[in-house]
């Protein structure tokens, strides 16, 4: 089970988990009180593919039907769970009485249903604040992909957004400055 920790110099209130089906993943929300304003923060770690090293070492000429079928089942099951999780996260965003900042590992690329569902009606801080920089956040494999996001309500303004190239994990952290 994953847990989130939010560190803030501002008071955090109304902390709760967003309910959805998952074996190990979680989304949580809390309200951040900044002077007389309140912003809803939604932190996410959506379903991963749970691929093992051997799953990624496929020689297409010699892959057995069983192995290919097993891999397809893993990909499909994780994708289905993420779609349902995205619906729950979007419902939480829509129900918020405050502007929202939604962050985290969506385990989905920008062209995916999951990203599109959660982003609908929101601003992608990377697209608006990165000034054309590369945005890969997941560093395994030969090509980096962007699966970690900072999104905000349209009433908020992304000012800057950067991917920090530090090696703390298999993901690079994403940092944004958001105005209101």
Task: Identify the residue ranges that each predicted region occupies.
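Metal-dependent phosphoester-hydrolase catalytic domains
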Residues: 84, 91-100, 106-180
């Amino acid at each position: 089970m994953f847990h989130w920790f939010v560190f803030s110099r501002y008071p955090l209130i109304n902390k709760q988990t967003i309910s959805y089906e998952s074996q190990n993943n979680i989304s949580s929300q809390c309200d951040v009180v900044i002077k007389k304003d309140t912003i809803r923060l939604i932190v996410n770690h959506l379903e991963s593919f749970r691929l093992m090293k051997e799953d990624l070492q496929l020689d297409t000429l010699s892959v057995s039907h069983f192995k290919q079928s097993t891999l397809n089942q893993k990909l499909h099951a994780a994708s289905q769970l993420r779609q349902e999780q995205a619906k729950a996260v979007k419902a939480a965003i829509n129900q918020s009485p405050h502007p929202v900042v939604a962050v985290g590992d969506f385990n989905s690329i920008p062209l995916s249903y999951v990203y599109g569902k959660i982003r609908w009606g929101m601003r992608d801080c990377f697209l608006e604040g990165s000034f054309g920089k590369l945005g890969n956040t997941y560093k395994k494999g030969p090509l980096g992909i962007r699966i970690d996001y900072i999104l905000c309500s349209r009433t908020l303004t992304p000012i800057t957004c950067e991917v920090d190239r530090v090696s703390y994990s298999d993901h690079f952290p994403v940092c944004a400055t958001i105005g209101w």
